[in-house]
Amino acid sequence: MRNVWLIVPFALLAALSGETWAQADRDLYIDSTESSGNYPVDDDDYSSGSGSGIPARGDDEDENVVLTTVQTLISSPSSEMPYVETTTLKTQTKMAPETKEPGEVESTNTVLVYGKKDIVQTATHTENLFHRTEVLAAVIAGGGIGFLFAVFLILLLVYRMRKKDEGSYDLGERKPSSAVYQKAPTKEFYA
């Protein structure tokens, strides 16, 4: 029975590692369709597939892409009305620059559709940077650490000032010469 418990983890490890190697082999040759080396003579016309993924256009119009998520919410769960989430892509050209306060982020438009009633609600709101809990927690933690550091620095300065008053530091006073101290005669007694 003990041997079975030792063999099962090794077999499981071998099975999982073999699966990841097979997955790595599939990912190795992603761009195999264009690997023949037969490119056009004019290299400027050829797109290598690397870069941002935005195709180059002849016109210089500024286009902004707005991503809108449409969610169909069902009032009661049933098999007749499945949950559907679709994403539509809209393009807008030459938007005027908006002035925003620093630290504010605008959220995306969301459209909610409920069942067959087709009630459409759109919501746009701005979010201040300090309303996010992780930013607020980081600011509070940084303030606490800074406060502790300041208290430690003040305590260190007070400690050094007290030690200086006690006389344990060399304050630049002259020490008496070694001639002032006389060596006591040493007498040796042998028994």
From Swiss-Prot:
InterPro entries in alphabetical order = Neurexin-like, Syndecan, Syndecan/Neurexin_dom, Syndecan_CS
Q: Which residues cross the membrane?
A: 138-158
* Keyword Signal annotated: yes
Region span, Disordered: 32-60, 168-191
Q: What does the UniProt PTM comment say about this protein?
A: O-glycosylated; contains both heparan sulfate and chondroitin sulfate.
Instruction: List the stretches on the Extracellular face of the membrane.
Output: 23-137
Q: Which GO terms describe its biological process?
A: cell migration
Cell compartment(s), UniProt: Membrane
Q: Record's GO cellular component, any one? A: membrane
Signal peptide, first to last residue: 1-22
- The keyword Membrane is assigned to this record: yes
Sorted UniProt keywords: Glycoprotein, Heparan sulfate, Membrane, Proteoglycan, Signal, Transmembrane, Transmembrane helix
Tell me which residues are glycosylated.
36, 48, 50, 52
- Please report the record's description of how this protein sits within the membrane: Single-pass type I membrane protein
Superkingdom of the source? Eukaryota
Q: Which residues lie on this side of the membrane: Cytoplasmic?
A: 159-191
What family classification does the UniProt entry report for this protein? Answer: Belongs to the syndecan proteoglycan family.
Q: What does this protein do?
A: Cell surface proteoglycan.
Please state what the protein is called.
Syndecan-2-A
Source organism (scientific name) = Xenopus laevis
Gene behind this protein: sdc2-a
